[in-house]
Amino acid sequence: VADEAARVAFAKNIKKILEKNKLDGIDLDFEWAETEKEYEDYSLAILKMREVLGDKYVFSVSLHPVCYKISKEAIAAVDFISYQCYGPSPVRFPMEKYCSDIQMALAYGIPKEKLVAGVPFYGVTKDGSKKTEAYFSFVQDGLITGPAQNEVTYKGDVYVFDGQNNIRAKTRYAMDQQLKGM
């Protein structure tokens, strides 16, 4: 999406796929923009996508607390923004980090009416090696012993995750902040 021709071609191809398959929308999940140029290109791609799709389709983007700085115009162009408040680092899982990440997005200018807070249903290794495992695996192996549990040893590695109480608390926080959803 680094040039106008590529953005136009990409948006037109997406529209063809939506029409052909009778889909109602698209979510762009271009993660890990790092430079101002990458943010600018992503923002321009978002604007081009909305221009080509018009208002007929639901159009959202997925952002992450370490890479969320799309332009104000791009924010305005989407129907909602999924905000991935988790991983790949274990430091992203605690409630305090989740709350500060939400506040950071709101302070940046993402309207609460467009912000959908994401929570994980997987765990990451506590040692920072970034191995992941589905929460279902922990349940299936009988490792979940209660709703307050947020850590488990699985196949020799210690994983952190959001247990039931954390998911409940994060959902309550999103509701209290009047976000679009979870």
Each language-model region and where it sits:
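P-loop/Walker A phosphate-binding loop and immediately adjacent motor/lid segment at beta-alpha junctions
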Residues: 47-50, 91-124
